[in-house]
Amino acid sequence: MTSPRARAAAGVSVADLGAYQQAVRRVLTCDLITKERPRPGVLDQVLRWADEMARDFRELLGYTLIATTHHVRLVRHLDVLDETQRSIFSRKGKPFDRRRLAYLCLVLGSFQRSRIEISLADLVRIFTPLANAIDGLGFDPAIGSHKAALVDVLGWLVDRGALRLSDGSLEWWARDTERGDALYDIDHDICAVLFKPARPVQHLTSAAGLVHEPPHSNPARRARRLLVEFPVVYYADVEPEVADALRAPGLAEDLVRFTGLVLERRAEGVMLADPGGVFTDRPFPGRGNAVSRAAGLLLAKIADLLEDPEHVPEPLPVPALADDQAGLVARMDAGLPRDGVVAELAWSPSEAEPPSPDDRPAPAQAPFVSRSRLETMTTELYDEFGAASFTSAWQQDPRGLLDAVIGFLSDLTLLRPVPGGVLVLPAALRYRNIRAALPTRTSGGQLALVALPEPTAQQDTPGQQDSSGQQGSSGQQDPSGQHGSSGQEVSFTQEEGR
């Protein structure tokens, strides 16, 4: 006889459940919580529930919660690679390029455990030969782009408390590398938890080694992870056993009680919806930058096109998630250095047999919208609202804005870029009546894109930090105000209650 399944938040009273769920959302959406980050007071709120959360994260998701009196860090154990997580490495809203990512790894590797402080001059002396030993990288403080990259990396570490400035100034050094200097205290405990890969990266022969578990182990846990980490999970994207787990009521009850979010079931898949729209690293719809707001307007135009009786949509197969994963691993492996890998310690992927066609779900189909049609829609938006409405960054670059919008909506699993255009995924049509990116006229008569007022139903705002404060789900806000499921698996293309 099997023992009964442990309930999420089993030791939390009804009166305290909201505070517990808020702490869970904080941990999921902030890569590192310290006394100052994301703001003072949050660490104490989270530490109150550390023991209970550690148990629930371990049993529900297989994650490890590291909690001390100084910081809280959730260590995820991945069974799928997610390229949307790149936004965790950014500075002032700008994502790190490969140079900055490489510099970050080299700087962290330069900190000796025996040293509790380091001057910027000493750090540069240690770091420079390491960077120059790597073909195509290098570091020269006389080159502005190199110096700017190092400044961003050190600022990123300061933001997380890994370094604390005790004397001098980084800005002074950036202006004058000969005379400027800074002295930093090193927090080795935080440095140690910032990067905890599944295996030592110097012994990997493939990026597949960054995944902790094979894809077919523990379908229920994989289903929970997909729901927490991705905006929407489509049944056609996952193995049949994972789809069955997603349909199981026990899984939904656990996650709803654990996170305080609303599980929305539809014929095509499942999603965790946040009525407040704050459980996310990419606020949508209605808040955020011009890209987010333009994305809402473009979705509205796409919905108008697909619902036009004179338009006959062209359905095309949606590429399988497994193929996307294989392509991502192949791109990463193409740049993987082979020098220095110790053959006796190296990890290589097992020679697994490819799944038979019968084991793979039938590919879903989605309507195709051509690139030329999308460009026409973008031009119409510029004509309707005026170029100035899209901020100075995009006034003269409508195609660049379109590229950014497509990437943004792709990260939210609403569009799927394919050669020649995009596929419109089912959840995109939740926003057919979008009201969060509306035009209003300024005092000068210029049309402007503005967001709806901030939601008042929930004061918890774990996603409202800089874009680097993310390691969790891209949960979406329900634009129609319909937060729950009707109990029937209607399509994303249908509105509940109709």
Task: Please describe what each predicted stretch is.
Residues 1-91, 167-183, 190-319:
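Eukaryotic partner-binding/assembly regions in large regulatory complexes
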Residues 24-44, 114-139, 232-237, 363-396:
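Short acidic, hydrophobic short linear motifs in intrinsically disordered regions
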Residues 48-53, 142-159, 394-408:
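Short amphipathic alpha-helical interaction segments
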Residues 61-65, 154, 158-169, 258-264, ...:
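A short, conserved structural fragment
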Residues 98-119, 294-368:
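Positively charged, polyanion-binding regions of nucleic-acid-associated proteins
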Residues 107-190:
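Internal, well-ordered domain-core segments that constitute the primary functional module
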Residues 164, 168-208, 273, 411-460, ...:
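C-terminal engagement modules used by replication, chromatin/transcription, nuclear envelope/ESCRT
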Residues 458-488:
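Long, intrinsically disordered low-complexity tandem-repeat segments
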